[in-house]
Structures are given as structure tokens and as C-alpha cells.
């Protein structure tokens, strides 16, 4: 079973990947936020900004989400760098 999700990229991640968002049909086995990050990082150079170990935050349907949070069909996943204030 495949599922389509909406992915949004913000700030420096948007610049690194060259787009602000996309709709993506996920391959089998990509069922969590962490698995999605790994899948996207495998696309190549600019996408390495999403690789594990990089300081990237994720939100699922506008709520903060860890790597082990499951993704469902029609979900919106946003990736962004940490925000600091001062």
C-alpha cells in the first residue's frame, strides 16, 4: 500500500533542497518521520541537510514530531531548522 503526503521545507532547508514543498507518494517501508527523513536524504547532495544527526526539527500536521512518529496518508510533514530567539 502506498500513501501520499504533503512535505514542507522551511528556511535553510528550503534553500538546500531548492523547493518549499511537494506532494510525495511514499514507497513501502517509509512509515515514520525518521524513515521519511532518511528517504529524502538519499536523494543526493542538497538533501543531505535532512540526514540523521543533522539538527532538523519536524512537525506532523502542525505538531512537533519525533523520528518514531508514524505517518499516515494525507498527512502534512514539515521540516525546519531549530529556531532561536534572543
What role is predicted for each listed range?
Residues 1-85:
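Ubiquitin-like/PB1-type beta-grasp interaction modules and other compact soluble beta-rich domains
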Amino acid at each position: 500500500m502506498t500513501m501520499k503526503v504533503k512535505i514542507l521545507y522551511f528556511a535553510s532547508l528550503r534553500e538546500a533542497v531548492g523547493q518549499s514543498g511537494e506532494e510525495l507518494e511514499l514507497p513501502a517501508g517509509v512509515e515514520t518521520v525518521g524513515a521519511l527523513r532518511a528517504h529524502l536524504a538519499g536523494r543526493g547532495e542538497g538533501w543531505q541537510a535532512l540526514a540523521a544527526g543533522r539538527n532538523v526539527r519536524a512537525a506532523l500536521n502542525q505538531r512537533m514530531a519525533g523520528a518514531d512518529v508514524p505517518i499516515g496518508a494525507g498527512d502534512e510533514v514539515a521540516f525546519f531548522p531549530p529556531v532561536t530567539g534572543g
